[in-house]
């Protein structure tokens, strides 16, 4: 099972401990192209691959504008060392579809039926899909029984509930003259959210971990 785990990295110092435990697949949110997580530049990521000889994947989860796309095109020649890119904006697919770079489709809440999933899996360099974590057990079984390639199943983390390209925390701070922070807890009587912001926008996570680990023994992992 360890060889199937993909760990998103928050701090480069974590990797040594994961590596000692036999984990060799790591996901790095890419600087300038990711939101909601600590990010890393290509030099940092490549140094990890060179040091540990592990599989490295990039997370590109921002909505990109034309300038972003043009800038991304400039780094494509530097991406040959990565094992794959988990992307959200279809522009990434359009820019990389004629390369040898492996892609993993990840449109957040949309990967909930095998028809959509298989459409993307039919593309030449799309090797997998990140399933939505809203799937009920019977829905998950149906998807796994019918997908044409192996997929990625989220098993532990926070659900991203909202993403805005606006810097909402800064807007609030400027409007109400409060001290600005790029991380905040927002809550009312019913629910609590973790807000994170960078120059590219703001995301809200439902501030309670989903945990699928206890259910793994009941899930057929042939397609995972």
Question: What label would you give each PLM region?
Answer:
Residues 1-119, 130-224:
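Active-site pocket-lining/capping segments in soluble small-molecule metabolic enzymes
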Residues 123-124:
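N-terminal capping/small domains of soluble enzymes
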